[in-house]
Curated annotation (Swiss-Prot):
Subunit structure: Homodimer.
Annotated family: Belongs to the plant dirigent protein family.
Protein name: Dirigent protein 19
Family matches, as InterPro entries: Allene_oxi_cyc_Dirigent (IPR044859), Dirigent (IPR004265)
Amino acid sequence: MGSFLSFFLISSRTLALVLISVTGETLESNFLHHKKEKLTHFRVYWHDIVTGQDSSSVSIMNPPKKYTGATGFGLMRMIDNPLTLTPKLSSKMVGRAQGFYAGTSKEEIGLLMAMNFAILDGKYNGSTITVLGRNSVFDKVREMPVIGGSGLFRFARGYVQASTHEFNLKTGNAIVEYNCYLLHY
C-alpha cells in the first residue's frame, strides 16, 4: 500500500509539472506570436533625497565598523524616489523609483541597484520596469539591465543608462538622469 501511494504521488507531481510546462509554453507562444515587439525610449530624472523631513531614501543598514571607509561597503538604503521629466524636483513627476541600493564593493564605490520604476502618468500609467544591476557611481555613464516589467511593459527587457546630473557632497542628495531603452510587446 505504501509503495503504491508513493508511486501515485510521484506520478501525479511529474504529470502536473509536464502539464504546467507545456501549457505555459503554449500560452506564452500564442501571446508572443500575436503581438509585435517594439522599442521604447524615455528619459526620467531620479531624485535621491537623503536629507530633510521629506527624504525619499532611508538607511536600513549601516556598514559594519570594520568597513567604515569611503566606499560604503555594507550600506543599504531603501528608496521611494521621485522620477521627474526634468532635473528640477518641482517639474512634473511621472513616476517613482522604489526598491533599494547597497554598497557592494570594498575597493570603490559600487552599488547593487534593485528597483522598480513605477510609471504614474501618461500612456504608461500603471506600468513598471525592473532594474537590477551594478552601478559604478563614478563612471560618467553606467549601464544596468532591465530584467522585466508589467502593464504595457510586460515581457520587457533592455537597459538603462544612468548619468549623474548633480551630487551634493554635503547632503548626499543626488539627481541622476536615466535613459531607458526597452523592448516589449
